[in-house]
UniProtKB/Swiss-Prot annotation:
It comes from the Bacteria. Mn(2+) binds at K200, H219, D258. It comes from Ruegeria sp. (strain TM1040). GO terms for biological process: gluconeogenesis. This is Phosphoenolpyruvate carboxykinase (ATP).
Length: 532
């Protein structure tokens, strides 16, 4: 039996997927919540939020992501970063997954990736779990109902958590698999209930397709000044560095919190929703995000709650530190209706420095911006990937290496060209530790970070006095309104100055060692900006 609204000429049977149980096409939020509840997939929380747990997988499994190596992509995929799968392995995986699906109920959402209609792609998401369908309906962009009648997908994603891959038969690493086949325009996900795999699969897809059109795909959040979309800012950063929190500024209009493109006519969100971390979420510091946790249909992932009152435990990380909520963009009161902005006037690169040696903000030259973009220094925040239980310093190129199918210099050169063409001012912002490394220091005060960003975005920080950092070479403001001067000089925040010097020297060497891999691909300006 099938139900819901769908193009009558583009059902799953028309794609060769037959023998399923009930198939539900493009159900809206109330129906999806009802289906998920009736199937025992979770609980109804306050305000109608849907509370779920994802079992042993509470973060992404980047080592289980594979790209099918065919002639059309063999020379363009960054194979050092993307595990390959043979076409034969994928064919066997697809056949076995479709066989496994027979007789089972499935949910289908026909959605759009990209707020700019010129560059958008149509995505069909087929999920075994009703709440996964609800999740992706929030996170991607929802076409008008009448447009579903002639919707044809450019790519199809099938997510079947109950299916387990056979590494020998399917040419993959483990029983968990995420397999992208650009020739067959299909992504298969199996063996994990973690919902983030759904959205990041679409992101990886766009990160491959858009550079061919001269569009810079970015792992960033974005906002713009009220009444002035030309005054756009983007915030690069790995998961947990503050993209969602810092872009949700009540004094600016939110474009999006995680994935964007920079085209010839400005920036645009890839998504239609947000996926925010909720650990220690504070209603005073982040009122807009906090409010979404009690709105109808918001997916609350891996949070504990009081069994009688259903009050959420925001400080309980017993399931994972990577607890999250997923909600549509319009749940944020100051979100942009178009999800589009101008060319970035300011580019902020967020780093979570677990060493505690970087300043809270630094101004970068275009060459330094290219250097830090390719370096992508940050810390993996607890829970965002399997096995990460405390901050781990890492270099994740483009501030999103797990999602980059092409070589880093492809994205780096696009960024350099865009900065040169539009004159963006670039900043490095440390949301990590101050006064010591992780374990001895403290987390950078969010009020100080917000004050510095406000000054950067309104242009007043450009008029401040700057000093050149002796270790890293960038310019650091000496003073800024609302921020203690001592905080702007990280060495002064350490009790043991010799320990700071040793830690800074260690990080400088790590930067230098990591960047050697990019030296053959960069120009002399960027080489001169390198930290060594």
């Amino acid at each position: 039996m099938t139900s819901g609204r769908v193009n009558p000429n583009f059902r799953l049977e028309d794609q060769g997927i037959e023998g399923l149980g009930n198939v539900y096409y493009n159900l809206m939020e109330p129906a999806l919540v009802q289906e998920a509840l009736s199937r025992g997939e979770g609980n109804l929380g306050k305000g109608g939020a849907f509370l779920v747990t994802t079992g042993k997988f509470t973060g992404r499994s980047p080592k289980d992501k594979h790209v099918v190596k065919t002639a059309s992509v063999a020379d363009t995929i960054w194979w050092e970063n993307n595990a390959e799968m043979s076409p034969e392995g994928f064919d066997a995986l697809y056949a076995d997954m479709v066989e496994h699906m027979k007789g089972r109920d499935y949910f289908v959402q026909d959605l759009v990736g990209g707020a700019d209609p010129v560059h958008a792609i149509n995505v069909r998401m087929v999920t075994e779990l009703a709440w996964h369908n609800l999740f992706i309906r929030h996170l991607l962009r929802r076409p008008d109902r009448e447009d579903l009648d002639d919707f044809i997908a450019d790519f199809t994603i099938i997510n079947c958590p109950s299916f387990q891959a056979d590494p020998n038969k399917h040419n993959c690493r483990s029983e968990t698999v995420i397999a992208l086949n650009f020739d067959r325009k299909m992504i298969l996900i199996g063996g994990t209930e973690y919902a983030g795999e759904n959205k990041k699969s679409v992101f990886t897809l766009l990160n491959y397709l858009l550079p061919e059109k001269g569009i810079m795909p970015m792992h960033c959040s974005a906002n713009h000044a009220k009444g002035n979309p030309v005054d756009t800012a983007v915030f690069f950063g790995l998961s947990g560095t503050g993209k969602t929190t810092l872009s949700a500024d009540p004094d600016r209009v939110l474009i999006g919190d995680d994935e964007h493109g920079w085209a010839s006519n400005g920036t645009f969100n890839f998504e239609g929703g947000c996926y925010a971390k909720t650990i220690n979420l504070n209603p005073e510091a982040e009122p807009e995000i906090y409010a979404t946790t009690e709105k109808f249909g918001t997916v609350i992932e891996n949070m504990t709650f009081d069994p009688e009152t259903f009050d959420l435990n925001f400080d309980d990380d017993s399931l994972t530190a990577n607890m999250r909520c997923a909600y549509p963009l319009h749940y944020i009161s100051n979100a942009s209706a178009s999800a589009r902005g101008g060319h970035p006037k300011n580019i902020i690169m967020l780093t979570c420095d677990a060493f505690g040696v970087l300043p809270p903000i630094a101004r970068l030259t275009p060459a330094q911006a290219m250097y830090h973009f390719l370096s992508g220094f940050t810390s993996k925040v607890a829970g965002t990937e399997r096995g990460v239980t405390e901050p781990e310093p890492t270099f994740s190129t483009c501030f999103g290496a797990p999602f980059m199918p092409r070589r880093p210099e492809v994205y780096g050169n696009l960024l350099r060209e865009k900065i040169a063409a539009h004159g963006a001012t670039c900043w490095l912002v440390n949301t990590g530790w101050t006064g010591g490394a992780y374990g001895t220091g403290s987390r950078m005060p969010i009020k100080a970070t917000r004050a510095l960003l406000t000054a950067a975005l309104d242009g007043s920080l450009a008029n401040a006095e700057f000093r050149k950092d002796p270790n890293f070479g960038f310019d650091v403001p000496v003073a800024a309104p609302g921020v203690a001067e001592v905080l702007l000089d990280p060495r002064r925040t350490w009790d043991d100055k010799a320990a700071y010097d040793a830690q800074a020297e260690k990080l400088v060497q790590m930067f230098s060692d990591n960047f050697e891999q990019y030296l053959p691909y960069i120009d002399e300006d960027v080489k001169a900006a390198a930290i060594c």
